[in-house]
Amino acid sequence: MNKPQVPNSMAPNSMAPNSSVTVGNVVFDNKAALALIAGPCQFESRQHAFDMAGALKELTAKLGIGLVYKTSYDKANRTSLSATRGAGMDAALPVFDELRKEFSLPVLTDVHTEEQCAIVAPHVDVLQIPAFLSRQTDMLVAAAKTGKVINVKKGQFLAPWDMKNVVAKITGSGNANVLTTERGASFGYNTLVSDMRALPVMAEIGAPVIFDATHSVQQPGGQGGSSGGERRFVETLARAAVAVGVAGVFIETHQDPDNSTSSDGPNMLPLKDMPALLERLMAFDRIAKGR
């Protein structure tokens, strides 16, 4: 990996990112116990959100792994104009408030414009910057200024060391609570590849590193009018990433992904498969971190 020389300083007037970031009662730290970000691709309905959050809360409490619940009110980056995008902010944000109160769960959702950051922030614990927006300076600054924890997906077009500049835009805006997420790199047409060397490189930046096990198996635009995916490789990649050592894993899951209204059905893991996967990942994590 021909990594270019990167200056030691993050950026003028920038602070270093926090190496340990706490969201609710969940700790993300590259040296601490593995944490989980999980939930369905899209917010489908209040009832579905409650069903999923309840099931994941029960599972993670039993296993002893910290959970941040994720879901998206809008999926703006779709292959087709006619693709399902989600219920929208007006329907989803009040339910996010309910989920936080009912289940005592921190909630993560993604934002797609600068204006959305301040609107969404009061209703969630983590603002997520989508991969295709990871270089948008105004977007990163607007998110940072909300004071919320920021999770930035690494663009499929970025080298792992390029995330240093992304993180610097956030810390330089006064927010040191940043998570960085690896979700694969473009590899020719309609496919991604996960380079596990990216994980320690990103860890050198100083922020907790997350591995997105479900979007990493995505085949962008692979079905013509929508994206495909190879769900069978989710566990393979997740195990590899956790064996390297990460702060957390990101997994989209659903009771019936093949018949869901969500856009990432081919990538999502069936909810019934989550217990066995998490048990194995936690075992890998204990070995990787010598715990």
Residue ranges and their predicted role:
Residues 1-7, 15-36, 286-291:
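N-terminal amphipathic alpha-helix/helix-capping segment at the start of soluble metabolic enzymes
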Residues 31-34, 63-67, 101-107, 123-125, ...:
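Short, well-ordered coil/turn segments that N-cap beta-strands
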Residues 36, 40-49, 67-89, 254-264:
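Glycine-rich, proline-tolerant flexible connector loops at the mouths of alpha/beta enzymes
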Residues 42-56, 87-94, 228-236:
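Glycine-rich anion/phosphate-binding loops
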Residues 56-63, 84-108, 143-149, 199-209, ...:
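Alpha-helix-loop-beta-strand connector modules within alpha/beta enzyme cores
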Residues 82-90, 103, 126-133, 189-196, ...:
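Active-site-adjacent loop and "lid" segments of alpha/beta metabolic enzymes
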Residues 87-88, 102-116, 125-138, 149-160, ...:
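Catalytic beta/alpha-barrel core
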Residues 146-253:
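Catalytic alpha/beta core domains of metabolic enzymes, predominantly
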